[in-house]
A protein has these predicted regions:
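Short, conserved catalytic-motif segment at the N-terminal edge
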Residues: 153-210, 232-237, 291-294
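Short, surface-exposed loop or secondary-structure junction motifs
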Residues: 251-442, 446
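Short beta-strand edge/turn micro-motifs at domain boundaries
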Residues: 114-146
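Short active-site loop at a secondary-structure junction
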Residues: 174-179, 200-257, 299-312, 377-380, ...
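Surface-exposed, charged secondary-structure patches
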Residues: 65-120
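Bacterial Sec-dependent N-terminal signal peptides
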Residues: 1-23
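Short, low-complexity N-terminal intrinsically disordered segments enriched in polar/charged residues
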Residues: 15-39, 45, 147-156
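Short, well-ordered beta-strand elements
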Residues: 119-120, 130-134, 437, 446-464
């Protein structure tokens, strides 16, 4: 259900009350009335200016039409709870949770003709929608029913780490898994768990593969860095010089701006249909991307040069790199990344069958189809294991590896604590510098932290798209010091 409507600017939740805010109810009722009458332009008018800039109207209208076709109209709306944010979390595809402002938000149960969903909504001081998401209603009894059966005979994790892990994993549905790699002083250890009949037990899954979502973007930037060092492209070159057709309006787009999300491009192309990412026979093809670039591409002048997270941007960068090399994505990523670092169970070709693949689940335990991004695969289609990602993490500690050093260089400052390299987010954590990227796809979430100076790291893969993964990664990273 996650792909039916965009989830944007969601902030993690700490404080909960049951007091409904009257102004939010007015906005929600207006949203529902416009949805039922299929007034999608009217819904777009309810959004804040910032949200309008980051999500184009076409993307909203396509998602809402798909929602209406699949679930029908809204029959009732019930207030659930009011929540106050307490922290900032970075995640990515297909959800971006970047708390630029610490807005509160309220949750409602929305009953459609064919299903029920949870609506989370936040409004700004002008009563405009600033944050919004529609998602499955999570089984609130999962947490209380969870049985802690975690063991650690090899002393891989501390009691504190075990407590943190259980606290996050008790939100998993049955058959949910988490796979961990811990890097301490350059040494790797693995831990895993699985929930079965509400019992959360240790489980060996270090070789099992999961969708890693937008951690894929780090690999795409890595290939870009390799091209720079091999003089195939320049870091400030425009992609226009490497295409065999003109970009619409001759808009100039640099590789670097694609890598660090400052290009002014939207999150997704406006000709991407809601059904594309789930159906093998109806993927977003390279021909579709070509048509978009030639006929529909628009640069938002207001956001160009500013950070606006874009899956389209990194997908486009990877597409152009593959055209330069004149090979498909599979050959490109195998040559420059997976073979080079002996990542034997990692692939960007999601069509390949893999007996090690853990099936993705919804928040309530329903199996989900895997993603088929095709033309936008460089933005989030890699499938990998914690064992393979740990190999890539260890490679970061090699001071002679110029490719990896280049993608860690700061290219854009987001705020006093967060900057961007080429692919990595760069986080200031007290006396340490951490390189981070997270990922979310429908049915999976991931988190990767690396401290190059101290040779520490944490990698988490799970087969449920949960908001707890990134926060757990951050807490486990802190626990290493």
């Amino acid at each position: 259900m996650r792909n039916l409507i965009i989830l944007f600017l969601l902030i993690p939740l700490l404080s909960i009350s049951q007091e409904e805010k009257p102004n939010e109810r007015i906005v929600v009722d207006d949203f529902i009335q416009k949805y039922n009458s299929q007034d999608y332009e009217g819904i777009f008018s309810l959004f804040s200016d910032q949200l309008k800039e980051e999500i184009p109207y076409e993307e909203i209208s396509n998602s809402l039409r798909s929602l209406n076709a699949n679930l029908g109209q809204v029959t009732s709306t019930d207030f659930l709870e009011f929540r106050k944010p307490g922290m900032i979390e970075f995640t990515v595809l297909p959800v971006i949770r970047i708390g630029l402002n610490r807005n509160h938000f309220s949750s409602y149960k929305i009953s459609f003709n064919k299903n029920e969903l949870r609506l989370d909504i936040s409004i700004d001081r002008e009563d405009k929608i600033y944050n919004i998401s529609l998602d499955e209603i999570v089984d609130e009894t999962l947490e209380e029913k969870a049985i802690n059966n975690l063991t650690d005979y090899k002393n891989i994790i501390s009691e504190k780490q075990k407590e943190l892990i259980f606290d996050a994993s008790k939100h998993l549905p049955n058959e949910g898994q988490m796979s961990f790699a811990f890097i301490r002083n350059g040494e790797v250890s693995y831990y895993g768990l699985k929930r079965t009949s509400d019992s959360i037990s240790s489980f060996e899954n270090s070789k099992n593969v999961f969708e890693i979502g937008s951690i894929s973007k780090v690999f795409t930037s890595n290939i870009f860095a390799s091209f720079i060092l091999q003089d195939k492209v320049g870091i400030d070159d425009n992609i226009n010089d490497y295409l065999d057709y003109d970009v619409k309006d001759n808009a100039l787009i640099s590789f670097k701006s694609l890598a660090n999300h400052t290009s002014g491009l939207p999150r997704l192309p406006n000709n991407l249909k809601a059904s594309y990412s789930r159906e093998k026979s109806n993927v977003y093809k390279k021909e579709d991307l070509d048509i978009y670039i030639k006929d529909s591409l628009e640069i938002n002048i207001k956001t160009k040069g500013k950070f606006v997270y874009s899956n389209l941007a990194v997908g486009l960068m990877g597409y152009v790199l593959s055209k330069i090399e004149n090979v498909g994505f599979d050959a490109l990523y195998n040559s420059y990344i997976f073979s080079k670092y002996n990542m034997d169970n990692t692939t960007i070709d999601s069509h390949k069958s893999n007996e090690l693949l853990v099936k993705g689940l919804s928040n309530v335990g329903n199996e989900l189809e895997n993603m088929y991004l095709d033309a936008l695969a460089p933005a989030g289609s890699v499938i990998s294991s914690v064992e393979d990602l740990a190999k890539y993490g260890l490679a970061q500690f090699d001071n002679s590896n110029n490719d990896l050093e280049l993608i860690r260089r700061k290219t854009f400052k987001l705020n006093n604590r967060v900057s961007l390299g080429l692919g990595w987010f760069i986080l200031k954590a007290k006396k340490n510098i951490w390189f981070n990227h997270d990922g979310n796809t429908g049915g999976y979430s991931s988190s990767m932290f690396i401290d190059v100076e101290n040779k520490n790291g944490v990698i988490i893969l799970t087969n449920v798209d949960t908001e707890y993964t990134s926060n757990l990664g951050l807490k486990l990273m802190k626990s290493l010091y």
